[in-house]
Amino acid sequence: MRTLWIMAVLLLGVEGGLWQFENMIMKVAKKSGILSYSAYGCYCGWGGRGTPKDATDRCCFVHDCCYGKVTGCNPKLGKYTYISENGDIICGGDGPCKEVCECDRAAAICFRDNLDTYDRKTYWKYPASNCQEDSEPC
């Protein structure tokens, strides 16, 4: 399911939402969000359940929680403005999608700050069956 969703985003050439998040991750963490975080642990990628497996997976858990609090903008499709300055991201505008930008900004910084915990060998394409326990509250 994750792979199908990722391919759809790429084929459609989406300019907002998730595509902007991908670009933001590239600028801040110097990694591809699609190739590095779209199917990682219990929370990075489509859906999420259970206990985050490491600090990187926790970045995705917090990002999911942040998206859950957004009102007035579809986080996966809404377009926002931002600039990259000196390795940091500054979200612009006052529209409803600025909240999404701030969620994405925090996650990109979290990925960068936790690159040392990223464990592709263990958590890439981690089986959902290992993420069945109840999720902690946001």
From Swiss-Prot:
Disulfide bridges in this chain: C42-C131, C44-C60, C59-C110, C65-C138, C66-C103, C73-C97, C91-C101
Key words of the record: Calcium, Disulfide bond, Hydrolase, Metal-binding, Secreted, Signal, Toxin
Enzyme Commission no: 3.1.1.4
Binding site for Ca(2+): Y43, G45, G47, D64
Keyword Disulfide bond on entry: yes
PROSITE patterns from the UniProt entry: PA2_ASP, PA2_HIS
Pfam families, A to Z: Phospholip_A2_1 (PF00068)
Claim: Lyase is one of the keywords in the record: no
Domain of life: Eukaryota
Signal peptide per UniProt: 1-16
One of the record's GO molecular function terms: phospholipid binding
Cofactor: Ca(2+)
Catalytic activity line of the entry: a 1,2-diacyl-sn-glycero-3-phosphocholine + H2O = a 1-acyl-sn-glycero-3-phosphocholine + a fatty acid + H(+)
SMART domains assigned: PA2c
Transmembrane segments: none
InterPro entries: PLipase_A2 (IPR001211), PLipase_A2_Asp_AS (IPR033112), PLipase_A2_dom (IPR016090), PLipase_A2_dom_sf (IPR036444), PLipase_A2_His_AS (IPR033113)
Family according to the record: Belongs to the phospholipase A2 family. Group II subfamily. D49 sub-subfamily.
Role played: PLA2 catalyzes the calcium-dependent hydrolysis of the 2-acyl groups in 3-sn-phosphoglycerides.
Name of the protein: Acidic phospholipase A2 PePLA2
